[in-house]
């Protein structure tokens, strides 16, 4: 880390890009008029989980900003009382940006409820201009991680059109 707290961690080829976990209990105040999880609350939790993964990957949250949330989708309604486990992993790296895939699953039954992709950008604390993060991806550890990386690349390709 430099004097501004900016991340300069470089991952070796054999280092796995870790999956980070956060949890939320769906309470009454998290519900919409259908008595299921309000989409805006779910989006906030998704971005929060992505930011946790981003900060952990960079070993600091300084200089990391959310650029956008993409392809957030619900596979089924989330009911009050559900224990949601958010699993987040860096799946794409550019020079100053990187993407984090986040999945929200039922902590007790492992049922997938929500997934989405978040793009983060690293910036200089003083100038607020983009700054390289120096993160690199290792080889995927399993088929699921490979599929997540391919989804990120497809999303990038779609956005370039």
Identify what each model region corresponds to.
Residues 16, 79-80, 91-161:
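HotDog/MaoC-like acyl-thioester-processing domains
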Residues 16-28:
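Short amphipathic
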Residues 26-28, 74, 120-122:
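Hydrophobic residues in beta-strands and at strand termini
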Residues 30-45:
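A conserved, well-ordered hydrophobic junction motif at loop->secondary-structure transitions
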Residues 37, 51-87, 91-98, 111-117:
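Hydrophobic beta-strand-centered segment that forms part of the acyl-chain substrate-binding groove
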Residues 44-48, 52:
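Short, residue-level hotspots on alpha-helical faces of the histone-fold
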